[in-house]
From Swiss-Prot:
Disulfide bonds: none annotated. The gene is GH3.9. GO terms for molecular function: acid-amino acid ligase activity. GO terms for cellular component: cytoplasm. Belongs to the IAA-amido conjugating enzyme family. InterPro entries: GH3, GH3_C, GH3_M. This is Probable indole-3-acetic acid-amido synthetase GH3.9.
Length: 441
């Protein structure tokens, strides 16, 4: 849990991120007993000091932890990555019974001092577990009483499901609720369902909800209310809130999966935006995720490797333009763990083609029929690259607690960072399958 510094509007009003307002509220502070992280550590605006303090307190109270959670799945993956990088110093501080100079915030040091005690046995345990190089099931190995993982794993966060399953040893992954900065939307009434099947039941008392059918003209006459949505259809959600937003388009696309009594249930599909486009092709985040998942499950997982994080961009620096997909890999075995270049060129090329086979017919037509789209390229980046991307975003004002890995990057400095961390790359070695559809007329 992390906060971001607040700012003031020209009119003198306080402006802050939604999660920051939650963590600074009296209601949240009254629930401090439910967390291993002391409030001072959560409210520390220095990301490293906050993460370090929360991790050391979590280790000291490892037998008390029954829920391993964060708002977004990405934050949990970052926490384990932090442990991978800093376990030596964490163990040293636990053995000494006090924080080193790397945590300088007085309020954080005071809060942690009430929890941290010299414990040579725990320090040695952390060293033994983390030095193995095998991070499979690390959550249940260090926090043995953990019953489930709690985080949002829908939409862009779906890419972390496999990684969390690996780190947790197969614990249930629970995505409890659906909310945004604008309002609260709904809850998951089947919390232990498969992460890929999460649906949220809309809470009709949190806002006035209307829905714009996907593909229809953006017009008030096409909006439907909660009672008139149809199962199987996709809608863009439009809200009118108590705070004053009127028919505000949130940008989320939802699919109706059923009803609980009279309340509709929705599955988050994607953000209403196109990620990649070179010519006539239009690839959104859901389609890109399916393509990555198809290649990963078919060609990487049998080799004990998976995609930990990914992003993409449309490269038009050469003609024809092509898709570039950046992968950071996770090696799911002690041998070679932490090595970013764990897939041979032939396999990586097959991954490129497998992704292309999963993309739309329009994309494949551009590749096969007229050559207007070049071969898809996968670039493997070294471990820790996406952590650096996050650090760059945070340094520019993004809240670490609400940070999401962008599914498409266009900012030159981010592209430059990614390209500077590439350890191997490969293009699709062949054309994807495409057969022209006969015209009905």
């Amino acid at each position: 849990m992390f906060v971001k510094s607040e700012t003031k509007t020209r009119g003198g009003l306080t402006a802050w991120f939604a999660l920051t307002s939650v963590y600074k509220s009296e209601q949240f502070k009254s629930m401090a007993i439910a967390y291993t992280s002391p409030t001072a550590a959560i409210l520390c605006e220095d990301a490293f000091q906050s993460m370090y303090a929360q991790m050391v307190c979590g280790l000291c109270q490892r037998h008390d932890v029954v829920r391993f959670g964060a708002v977004f799945a990405a934050a949990l993956v970052r926490a384990i990555r932090f442990l991978q990088l800093n376990w030596g110093q964490l163990a040293a501080d636990i053995e000494a019974g006090e924080l080193g100079p790397h945590v300088a915030d007085p309020s954080v040091r005071e809060a942690v001092s009430g929890i941290l005690r010299s414990d040579a046995e725990l320090a040695e345990f952390v060293r033994i577990e983390c030095s193995k190089g095998d991070w499979a099931g690390i959550i249940t190995r260090i926090w043995p009483n953990t019953k489930y993982v709690d985080a949002i794993v829908t939409g862009a966060m779906a890419q972390y499901i496999r990684t969390l399953q690996y780190y947790s040893g197969g614990l249930p992954i629970v995505s409890t609720s659906y909310a945004s900065s604008e309002c609260f939307f709904g809850i998951n009434l089947r919390p232990v369902c498969d992460p890929s099947e999460v649906s949220y039941t809309i809470m009709p008392n949190t806002a006035y909800f209307e829905f714009l059918p996907v593909g229809e003209v953006v017009d008030a006459t096409n909006l439907v209310d909660l009672a008139r949505v149809e199962v199987g259809r996709e809608y863009e959600v439009v809200i009118t809130t108590y705070a004053g937003l009127s028919r505000y388009r949130v940008g989320d696309v939802l699919r109706v999966t059923g009803f609980h009594n009279a309340a509709p249930q929705f599955r988050f599909v994607r953000r209403q935006s196109v990620l990649l486009s070179v010519e006539l092709d239009k690839t959104d985040e859901a389609e890109l995720h399916r393509a990555v998942e198809r290649a990963s499950s078919a060609l990487l997982r049998p080799r004990g490797v998976s995609v930990a994080e990914y992003t993409s961009r449309a490269c038009t620096e050469r003609i024809p333009g092509h898709y570039v997909v950046y992968w950071e890999l996770l090696t799911e075995s002690p041998v070679g763990a932490g090595d970013g270049d764990t897939v041979d060129g032939e396999t990586l090329g097959r991954c490129c083609l497998e992704m292309e086979e999963a993309l739309s017919a329009v994309y494949r037509q551009g590749r096969v029929a007229d050559g207007s789209i070049g071969p898809l390229e996968i670039r493997i980046v070294r471990p820790g690259t996406f952590e650096e991307v996050m650090d760059l975003a945070v340094s520019r004002g993004t809240s670490i607690g609400q940070y999401k890995v962008p599914q498409c990057v266009t900012v030159p400095s981010v592209v430059e960072l990614l390209d500077s961390r590439v350890v191997s790359s490969q293009f699709s070695p062949a054309l994807p399958h495409w057969i022209p559809t006969p015209r009905s007329d």
